[in-house]
Amino acid sequence: MANTLYDRTIAFAGICQAVALVQQVAKDGHCDKDAFEASLSAILNTNPANTVGVFGREANLKLGLECLVKGIDSTPAGSDITRYIISLMALERKLSSRNDSMSQLGDRIQTAERQTEHFDLFDEQMISNLASIYLDVVSPIGPRIQVSGTPAVLQQTSSQHKVRALLLSGIRSAVLWRQVGGKRRHLIFGRKKMIEQAQILLARM
């Protein structure tokens, strides 16, 4: 995969989309269906031809690109998104430094891939399976990501499964970010360029 601004923008939009969906689910119990399906599909797409191939096509990242362009404002919702992104990227760094966990993650994702021969990926059973991968493999590495939302919604098992499956998708995009050469300095000094790239992509949708 190429280490270009385009590739980094796609990978970072993948992280943004996952956390924007986490926020939607935590607040309302449901979220943008197309974006949700694209983000979950990305988890199992482990051998793509190129970076955008992880998500199928650029249009599948519309929500993530919009989230990237809008930027992270100082509202409580914006602060939550920032916190989720920082937490996911820190978690991925810890995960990638542990070969045992990375190998376990790879095995569990392959198992989930085989399960899609019998279940639809967006079936409650499959969402629960993806959630358990996050809970068993990623979450113990810590620190835990505290999700803010509507308490009654967050108490529902289906919402918890969706949130964890989406956090796993965020980890998938954070791995991709690292694979295409994404570094912390790109977020600090190259954010403006990524926003411009995202605007170009949105304009052609």
From Swiss-Prot:
Belongs to the HflD family. This is High frequency lysogenization protein HflD homolog. PANTHER family: HIGH FREQUENCY LYSOGENIZATION PROTEIN HFLD. It is a peripheral membrane protein. Pfam families: DUF489. Keywords: Cell inner membrane, Cell membrane, Cytoplasm, Membrane. InterPro entries: HflD, HflD-like_sf. One of its GO terms (cellular component) is plasma membrane. It comes from the Bacteria. It is found in: Cytoplasm; Cell inner membrane. SUPFAM superfamilies: YcfC-like. Gene3D superfamilies: HflD-like.
